[in-house]
């Protein structure tokens, strides 16, 4: 799978993996902040942005394999991976499959838990609705929790436009893939690399218990909770998020 991607800067490599139903432009502030010190790769996952769409279902392992293929094609060896929401699931797939390849990971607004039977059924129903009725179905759902109470209107407008532009087939395929995600807790219990765990205190999905469970499941966690923001701390609290992520990456970079 040939992914569209941005490639900026020089130095130790950092890969930024967006969530669902977004695209690589979600990371524009971080790419700008990190490119002076790192080589930053920000791909569009399969089915989003300018990457090809695969209909019906794409699993987290398939998204991860696309990233591995991209890094192999670019001749990139050790890298850090930063994933938000579904991108965090893909990050965990990468780290579980090839832990020796990554010098650090960052898990932002995500979960290690497998879906419950009800969650699985809901995602499958929502996938069918998105295919039938378009992205408005998913955007309406995202509005129930994606933004914190003080999210700037400019961020809302930008993210709404990003979600509206997502291909319905790609978004539905991701929903079905997420419905089949594994339990990452045992897969990452022995992971011996630094792991930044970041969430917003007003995120109803990656809430305090979910985030605490991620921290408890890792050997070398570092935790950042950003007060008052929702599911997109990298945009709602750009300055604070960039400072925390940059400090973490600089502290653990091999170069």
Describe the predicted segments one by one:
Residues 6-56, 60, 70:
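Conserved HGGG/HGGXW glycine-rich cap/lid loop of the alpha/beta-hydrolase fold
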Residues 201-206:
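Acidic catalytic loop of the alpha/beta-hydrolase fold
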Residues 193, 207-216:
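Short alpha-helix in the alpha/beta-hydrolase fold that links the catalytic acid
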Residues 77-116:
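Conserved hydrolase catalytic core segment
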């Amino acid at each position: 799978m040939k992914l569209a991607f941005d490639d900026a800067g020089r130095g130790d490599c950092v890969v930024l993996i967006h969530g669902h139903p977004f695209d690589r432009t979600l990371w524009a502030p971080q790419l700008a902040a990190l490119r002076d010190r790192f080589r930053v790769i920000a791909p569009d996952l399969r089915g989003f942005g300018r990457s090809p769409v695969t209909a019906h279902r794409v699993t987290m392992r398939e998204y991860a394999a696309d990233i591995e293929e991209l890094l192999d094609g670019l001749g990139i060896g050790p890298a850090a991976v930063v994933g938000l929401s579904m991108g965090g699931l893909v990050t965990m797939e990468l780290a579980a499959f090839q832990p020796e390849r990554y010098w650090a990971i960052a898990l932002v607004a995500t979960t290690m838990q497998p879906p419950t039977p009800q969650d699985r059924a809901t995602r499958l129903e929502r996938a069918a609705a998105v295919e039938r009725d378009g992205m408005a179905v998913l955007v309406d759902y995202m509005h129930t929790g994606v933004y914190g109470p003080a999210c700037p209107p400019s961020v809302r407008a930008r993210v709404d436009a990003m979600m509206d532009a997502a291909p319905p087939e790609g978004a539905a395929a991701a929903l079905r893939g997420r419905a089949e995600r594994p339990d990452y807790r045992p897969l990452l219990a022995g992971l011996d690399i630094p792991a930044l765990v970041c969430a917003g205190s007003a995120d109803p999905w990656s809430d305090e218990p979910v985030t605490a469970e991620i921290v408890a499941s890792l050997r070398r966690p570092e935790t950042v909770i950003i007060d008052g923001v929702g599911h997109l701390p990298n945009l709602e609290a750009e300055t604070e998020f960039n400072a925390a992520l940059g400090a973490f990456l600089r502290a653990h970079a091999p170069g």
